[in-house]
Amino acid sequence: MPSLTMTDSSYIGRFAPTPSGFLHFGSLVAALASWLDARAVNGRWLLRMEDTDPPREMPGARDAILQTLERYGLHWDGEVVFQSQRHDAYAAVVDRLFNMGLAYACTCSRKQLERYNGIYPGFCRNAGHAREGAAIRLRVPELIYRFTDRVQGEYQQHLGREVGDFVIQRRDGLYAYQLAVVLDDAWQGVTDIVRGADLLDNTPRQLYLQELLGFSQPRYLHIPLIVQPDGHKLGKSYRSPPLQAEHATPLLLRALRALGQETDPELLLATPAEVLAVARTQWRPEAIAQRTTVPEADLR
């Protein structure tokens, strides 16, 4: 795996929030990790809005996300990319995969699949259903896909046994995360993906899609999720409090500690820009805990 140097300006990272709610502390930890990993090597940091699911989108969330990032000093490079404006690109790839026989129409309902624990049993694989009103699934090989995560270490998954053929376009016509994220990362030239460990088990599916479409494989760094006492991650569905501009400095320092970084108590009096300037020069991804969760109660 290529190593990163302090002058690796070829680095392109990204943060890709979903506008289904406001940013919260867990979002901040993910954004900060990806921002620091890019800026520490003089790389670029892109912002992409993963707005492919309009029914889940919260009014005003897009603007609120942009404003919050700016107020916390997490400035991005270039224009914001909106996945809702990329449907033609997604459609072209779905058509190609379907026409090549690499994907097929699936009419299975959620109720039919409930007892299979998320592993698709292949009911429609050879049924030859028409595409209209059906989901589109990608055929997966009976192979193990593995990669070395920069924090979590070696990870592997047998796609056939542990996932099964997976959806790339839903029956309502909306495009699946797995397809959109792979196409957009390749289109934007992303070299490094820093995100939460809840997406660790998604990565082998993305590696397969990258291989199928002839894309380069980026480096991956999956950070521990901040979880509540009941084990659920901080998130919009659990009404985690939104980030407030007036708390930017203490929350940035807390996020740094969640990432295993040293913080100077004197920085409590600093501006967000000053905190980030120091953190950028002291960024040590190897200090991030090799675990998938960190209880919020453990953070100072």
From Swiss-Prot:
Domain of life (superkingdom): Bacteria
Cofactor requirements of the protein: Zn(2+)
Motif ('KMSKS' region) on chain: 233-237
Molecular-function GO terms, alphabetical: ATP binding; glutamate-tRNA ligase activity; zinc ion binding
The keyword Aminoacyl-tRNA synthetase belongs to this UniProt entry's keyword annotation: yes
Motif mapping: 'HIGH' region: 17-27
GO CC entries: cytosol
Chain positions recorded as Zn(2+) binding sites: 106, 108, 120, 124
Function, in words: Catalyzes the tRNA-independent activation of glutamate in presence of ATP and the subsequent transfer of glutamate onto a tRNA(Asp). Glutamate is transferred on the 2-amino-5-(4,5-dihydroxy-2-cyclopenten-1-yl) moiety of the queuosine in the wobble position of the QUC anticodon.
Membership in a protein family: Belongs to the class-I aminoacyl-tRNA synthetase family. GluQ subfamily.
HAMAP family cross-referenced by the UniProt entry: Glu_Q_tRNA_synth
Protein name, as recorded: Glutamyl-Q tRNA(Asp) synthetase
Taxonomic source organism: Pseudomonas putida (strain ATCC 700007 / DSM 6899 / JCM 31910 / BCRC 17059 / LMG 24140 / F1)
Gene that this sequence comes from: gluQ
